[in-house]
Amino acid sequence: MELQDEKVVRAVPSIGYVHRGLEKLVELRDFQQYVYVAERVCGICSFGHGWGYSRAVEEMMEIEVPPRAEWLRTIWHELSRIHSHLLWLGLAADAMGFESLFMEAWRLREIDLDLIEQTTGGRIIFSVCKVGGVRRDIDGAVLKEMKRVLKDLSEKFLPMLNVFMDDDTVHSRLKGVGKLTMEEALELGCIGPMARASGILTDIRAAEKDSVYGQLHFQPVIETDGDCYARARVRLREVLRSVEIIEGCIDNIPDGPIDVKVRGVPPKRECFVRVEQPRGEALYYVKGNGTKFLERFRLRTPTNANLPALVKMLQGCDLADVPNIILTIDPCISCCER
């Protein structure tokens, strides 16, 4: 950053210094083995990356995933979203010196992580998604207990949310800071909570009418102020929306198998799918060549898409506001350095 009297004059992203070459590894791994690599693009969004890659391969190979597997995938994806947003809340509170809220947010995050561990065996890397379905089922008793735990989590989260949103310190640090109008957000290609905080109705979950989200009549969370406070509100309201989605999945999940046997190898075709990660829309592109090794895998992560907007918001802001502006786009260095 270039500064002039405590004001940011110019900001330039500096990425690519710890590039890991995960996309290149698709040429060296069986297309089914690569799910494990895709999950390691990012720890916070690990399930979503494994799901996005699996969906792309399934569409390319015309594999029909059993309905129960799709509902289970949705449950785990929303648990991952709750985990991500509570992690973000703790970091944001810590950056503002709100240490009690930081500890409370991460205490609730542990409840969510315990549910993930109980149903997948892992807390960060789930390793339950596969091409053709999922590796684990969740029985009725566990689903019933999950619904009770999530109800308790939301009841504890709501008063904490109100305290955060009504606090004078939070208002002074976030309101009117890092403002991005709807027109600017559209021009800069914002996605996810960044776009929804500026009044743009964009959410892949709502766009896919034939998915589980469509059957649950999902409606995205929208704010219109476009500042750091609005972006915080979107993420925190999405925690409660994710709880509602999981409860709907538990009430409506069908019986049946959780995977199908994958036969053959990916054909000479290409395909891409979109997944709404906690930070925004991620694009997954795959290209087959008739062997068990894919010719190409390409991933566009949410942080990359939101970087131009971050540069715009930082120009002209006070140096003291830089950490909060960066935090409210919820950047993921691991996603950028894949």
Question: Which functions belong to the PLM regions below?
Answer:
Residues 2-338:
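Active-site bordering "gate/hinge" segments
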